[in-house]
Amino acid sequence: MAKLSGTQTHENLKMAFAGESQANRRYLYFAQKADVEGYPDVAALFRSVAEGETGHAFGHFDFLAEVGDPVTGVAVGATSDNLNSAITGETFEYTEMYPGFSKTARDEGFEEIAEWLEVLARAEKSHAGRFTQGLETLND
């Protein structure tokens, strides 16, 4: 097979992976709303399709894995590689992404959103720590 890295197909797979992943989360959110509104059959429909979207995302990721994690660029494969990728992603989120987003929200007058993003930064820091502990257990 041709080299995937740096091709338009690589970019297309990354966009498709992101889209399918987001569809999964959106449909799970919609399912919660349908449950609250008393539509359990519609909620089940959303959950069923969300699971299908997960399968689509996993299919894209199978191809992307040969190049590396589409978010972090870190190698995908062994559990230690996957933990390192997770640590890289979570660390970026709590050190750069959410602090930057929070500052922008605050600068634009969205204090409640800024505070929410700061909560998420703390959560992502915790996630990075938990993944780091998981990696350390592999090295024991």
What are these regions (language model features)?
Residues 1-140:
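Non-heme di-metal
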